[in-house]
């Protein structure tokens, strides 16, 4: 065992037996290597592990040096919204579909992770968004997002009329089905499907991408990540929501605004030494193959 990582957390919500197999393999392998291992409580229960140290995501964030998330991008997003609050590095083993954020191949995870544990990895910080539903600047509801915050109707699709203020200065008004406010991490997710630009992860920028706007002049906008975005609504309805990473929904009531800003903390994401963002774009999204 080396001194790069001493305590390692195993995280993820397995949806099929192969993911559980990876969790069990990882746990037993790390134990034989002499690491202190904390297993997320649900995983330990499903694997029926005995005499094992378990914890919540928050406890793993407080106690571990590294969290290994086994699953797809949904698992990664759900775990890292909590883990980002703590001084912990995070890496993913892909047991989902796309696996854009989970770098390690499950068939070669031991060797790849062994190299990472020896200190051979690339580290980067990814910022999150904080979304608040407010009434007269009094916070009512709050959540965070790794990928994006989306304004959308609640149960029935319909057009929304709203105004966007950037740093309390009017920017534009819009009639559309909603608005996607995305981080660089999320620029290859929902935002990309809506026609938004791809932002490399190190950019300090936020994109605002209209969803099915009523006019042809409505285009995506890229702003500095230090800016604060305020959404105001012209026709007060009780069926609007904002969703964070398509996992958490916050209702918007009459007379309420939405404030979106960069979080005060970052996700400490790490990758294998041979990681390339542009290669990931090519292999995962079929982006721009080499011609010669």
Curated annotation (Swiss-Prot):
List the active site. Answer: 73 (proton acceptor)
Catalytic activity entry: NAD(+) + ATP = ADP + NADP(+) + H(+)
Q: Could you say which cofactors this protein requires?
A: a divalent metal cation
What top-level class of enzyme does the UniProt entry assign? transferase
NCBIfam families membership: PRK01231.1 (NF002306), PRK03378.1 (NF002893)
- What does the UniProt function comment say about this protein? Involved in the regulation of the intracellular balance of NAD and NADP, and is a key enzyme in the biosynthesis of NADP. Catalyzes specifically the phosphorylation on 2'-hydroxyl of the adenosine moiety of NAD to yield NADP.
The protein here is known as: NAD kinase
